[in-house]
Design a protein with these regions (language model features):
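Short aromatic-glycine-enriched beta-strand elements
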Residues: 201-222
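A short macromolecule-binding patch
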Residues: 215-239, 269-272
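Intrinsic-disorder/low-complexity, polar/charged segments enriched in Ser/Thr/Lys/Arg/Asp/Glu/Gln
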Residues: 189-193, 255
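Nuclease catalytic cores that cleave nucleic-acid phosphodiester bonds
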Residues: 66-189, 201-203, 207, 240, ...
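Domain-level signal for Mg2+-assisted phosphodiester chemistry and nucleotide/NA-binding surfaces
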Residues: 1-103, 143, 147-151, 263, ...
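Conserved RNP beta-strands of RNA recognition motif
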Residues: 204-209, 253-256, 270
Length: 281
């Protein structure tokens, strides 16, 4: 088995919190995000979170103000720098008020300026406006990884050196029924998320692939490799969600959440399968 040596890479993490929260990642665990970004024991040189803050609302709503400040404090305890983008209020011709707080420009400028000292950048966003930022970072010699959940720009996926769905990262987002007493991700009886990489249309069964640990070897997808961080689970089509079209399988774009049951042969069995992404139409 390969021995993982300490990396000398310097990493920057930049989180577009509004985009992530609006698109499936509202309960994202920032400590796990940091661990994922530094999965090869790299040094986290920059950890930036861009948050919106409604100062006008905070003046009249103590609950909002206290929760927002407590959330920011929790992020700082994890080593993140919190960059606050204040909501600006406007009024249209009909007299309706609306707020704006776009942190895209701030985040883009920061990552470009700070990339001089970085080897790798992780952008937590699905916003296609960052495509040019990705290209600029790559031209400066940085490896660029992106992570998001729903409504991800296809162009952003393609331009990134690696795109990872946040749904697949162990522990990054709580699973259904996740609590203190639940088995840990990857253990028998636990809930995990993965995708179907093989499907037999004639015999009506397939195999799910899922991550069991954070690892620098994400490219080793063959679970037979002892260094691979992936495992597989067998499933029968009858266990898939009602209404799901099996002709779409295999697919890396359809992410399922399922329970790992006792092995039927070599692989565990995926049961109680839910479609997490995209939503079942």
């Amino acid at each position: 088995m390969t021995v993982i040596l300490k990396s000398h890479a310097k990493v920057g993490v930049y989180v577009d919190a509004a985009n992530i929260s609006r698109n499936g990642g509202q309960r994202m665990q920032y400590d796990v995000l940091r661990e994922f970004a530094c999965r090869d024991h790299a040094e986290p040189l920059r950890l930036n979170v861009y948050l919106t803050y409604d100062e006008e609302r905070a003046e009249t709503n103590a609950v909002y103000r206290d929760k927002a400040r407590a959330y920011q404090s929790a992020l700082r305890e994890l080593g993140y720098k919190v960059i606050e983008k204040r909501v600006k209020w406007f009024q249209d011709e009909a007299g309706n008020r609306y707020g704006k707080a776009n942190a895209d420009l701030d985040m883009a400028v920061d990552v470009l300026l700070q990339s001089e000292n970085l080897d790798r950048v992780l952008l937590a966003t699905g916003d296609g406006d960052f495509v040019q930022v990705v290209r600029a970072l790559q031209n400066k010699g940085c490896r660029v990884e992106t992570l998001a959940f729903d409504n991800v720009s296809e162009e952003l996926r393609r331009e990134s050196d690696m795109f990872v769905s946040g749904y697949l990262v162990p522990g990054l987002l709580p699973t259904r029924g996740d609590d203190y007493f639940a088995p840990g991700w990857g253990a028998m009886g636990s809930r995990v998320r993965g995708y179907c990489y093989h499907h037999d249309d004639n015999k009506s069964f397939g195999f799910m692939r899922f991550l069991v640990k954070l690892s620098p070897y994400l490219w080793k997808t063959d679970s037979r490799d002892p260094d691979s961080p992936y495992r597989t689970a067998f499933f029968h089509d009858s266990s898939l969600p009602d209404g799901f079209n099996v002709m779409k399988l295999p697919s890396r774009n359809h992410i399922f959440e399922f329970t790992l049951a006792e092995p039927n042969g070599k692989q565990p069995v995926a049961t109680d399968i839910l479609l997490v992404h995209p939503a079942l139409s």
